[in-house]
Every structure is written in C-alpha cells, then in structure tokens.
Amino acid sequence: MRFLFYMLLACSAVVAGEQAAAAKELRLNSFVHRSFDAHIHAQRLLRDRRSVDEERGLPTVIEKTKTLFSTKVTDKTLQRWAANKKSPQHALIRLDLDNAGKDLFTKAKFADWVSFMTKRNPQNAEAAMLSALMTRYSDDVLSGMLIAAKKAPDTKTIATNLQIQQLRGWMKKGKTADDVFNLFNLKGKATSLDDLVSDGQFAPWVTYVTALNKGDPKKTNMMVVKTLTTYNKKTHKGVYDMLSASKNKQLAADLQRGQFDNWLANNVQFYDVSAMVGAKGTPRGSPQRLFVKDYVAAYNKKHQL
C-alpha cells in the first residue's frame, strides 16, 4: 500500500483536525496540477526596521499619528480599508502591529488584520497574507512563528492554512526535503521514528516529500530515509535500528524498504548491508538475516549474477 496512507494513518492520533485537513489539501494535486498563484516575493530576509521606515517615509509617520488618535477599529473600518485597496502594511500600522516582530500571531489585533486581508483578497486571502509576511520575515523565522501558532487554539486554523501556502512557495523555490526538515525543526527527533510521528510537522513534511516525488511511494520512502540518515548521526545502522524499534510497524517497514532500495540503487555490497543491519550473530531466520537474503537476491538480479 502507498507510503503516504500509512504515514497519515500513523499520525491520525496526534494530528488535529485542521492539520489533517491541511495535509490532505497539500497532496500531489495541490502541487502538480494546480497553478502556483501566491505571487510570493523573492525577498525573504527579516528587514531592518530603519530601512523599511525610510522606504515608507512620510506615509508611515502619518499612519502612526492616525493610530494614536483613532478610535477602535470596527468591521466597518476594515471593510472601508479593503474597498479602498489599502495595503497590508497600511493595515499593520493602523492596527499597531508593524512592530510586533515574532509575536505577531499572539497579538489580539492580528485577527483584525486577517479579517482585513480576507475582505481585500476574498479569492486568495491566505496567499496574499503569506506574500505580505514574507516581505517582513525570513523563511526560518516565519516557519517558527507558524509552528508556534499552530499550537494555539485561536491561531491554529489560520497558521495551518498559511503553512500550506508556505509549502507551495518552497516547492516553487525548489527547497529540498532536507531544507524543509530543518525549517520544521525536526532534525532533533531524527533518532526516533515515534517521536517524529508525534510531531505535528511530520505529516506536512512527508506530504511535501511525496509532492517532490510526484506521488511515487518508492521514491518518497527512499528520500525520507535519506533525510533521516543525514540527521541520524549519518549512520545507516542507526536508522535501521530506529525503524526496527518503532511502534509504527507498517510505516517502519515501508521506510526499511526505502533503505533497502537506496542501498540497491547505490550498489552497496551485501556484506556492508549485513554489517549495517547487524545480521552477524543473529539466529537464522531473524529479520536482519532475511533482509540480507532478500538484498542479495535483488542485487544478483540487478547485475544478472
């Protein structure tokens, strides 16, 4: 059966409804058959406050002054801003959010900004929001903010939707599986499959890897294992042992097959495979010996030996 199915099955107990729905939405069709219309800007560095103020110039001072004397922002106000095509930056300033930094999603008025952006961009609100945020925050900073926001009830849904847009942008930019694994702060859990599965970022990451491989389960398994090996002290045996010890048996079996296919693709000798799975000293019929036996058969078939 397909790897992604087992991944989602394993994650179902720990991924909340919105996350599961978001992961489902981010399947292959979202990346391959739908156009990327987020129009995300190339600049991704967290910009220097002074240079931003210099670019905005006098309008910034005026908007700041309006903030000091304005009454409470109402839905009618947001509607007027949207009708007048006010910029996302204008709304952030008027809502006194432009200096919120990494705490933007925790601010009470952030919901007003989301409402304004939805009114202004009813067809692609999340894409427009992400585009605006990416002019203010670098990839790693914004990713960390979204991960934190997904854990808070009030911002979980919007953060999940924004993360979908972020993944689409990364796909367009050509970020690798390792890049996203790192941005999702998963590398510290690469020594335990069970810890990875329990992390809410694992499901979106695997979905991203699946999209990178155009839905091919074999290539997906191989890429997942390659990334795990990179962050598992770069030891193949460490990954094999980790998978063998996992409670997520079907997922572990799929990934061990990915490890098998990686070694076969790289023409690793059977005695090296035997050492990496720890077959020596195990009884006949052990999982390790059966693994090596299957590998020898596949290797000989590949090379017509």
Curated annotation (Swiss-Prot):
Keywords: Host nucleus, Secreted, Signal, Virulence. Coiled coil: none annotated. GO terms for cellular component: extracellular region; host cell nucleolus. Residues 1-16 form the signal peptide. A motif (RxLR-dEER) lies at residues 44-56. It is found in: Secreted; Host nucleus; Host nucleus, Host nucleolus. The keyword Secreted applies. The keyword Ribosomal protein does not apply. It comes from the Eukaryota. Induction: Expression is induced during host plant infection. Its main location: secreted. Belongs to the RxLR effector family. The RxLR-dEER motif acts to carry the protein into the host cell cytoplasm through binding to cell surface phosphatidylinositol-3-phosphate. Effector that enhances P.infestans colonization of Nicotiana benthamiana leaves. This is RxLR effector protein PexRD25. The gene is PexRD25.
